[in-house]
Amino acid sequence: AAARQLADALGCTAVLKGSGTVVAAPGQIPVLNLTGNARLGTAGTGDVLAGLVAAHLAAGQNAFQAACAAVHQHGQSADDWPDGEALTAGTLARRLRV
C-alpha cells in the first residue's frame, strides 16, 4: 500500500526495495518482485539498481516497465551469484547487461 500511495501522491513510478521489492505507478497494479536475497543489503547495490532502471529507460521502456525489469534482473543476479564470492556493488554493476 505504501508504494502505491507514494506513486499516486508524486505521480511517478516508485520502487520500495526490500525483502519482496514493490514497484508501483499511477494506473498500474503494483508488482511484488520475489527475486533477490540479503546480499543486496550491501552498500551501493541500491545505486546499481537505480542505474539499471535508467539503462532500461534509455533502452526505450516506459518507467514502470523499466523499474519492473530492473528490479527482477537485479534480484535474479543476486540469486544466481556464486557461493563463496563476495557480492559488491562494483562487481554486480560490471556483470549486469541490458
Where are these regions (language model features)?
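Short, charged, surface-exposed loops that flank catalytic or proteolytic processing sites
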Residues: 1, 60-68, 82-87
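A short structural micro-motif
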Residues: 13, 73-76
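Short active-site-adjacent structural elements
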Residues: 23-26, 49, 75-82
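Glycine-rich phosphate/pyrophosphate-binding beta-alpha loops
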Residues: 37-41
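Short, small-residue alpha-helix embedded
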Residues: 42-73
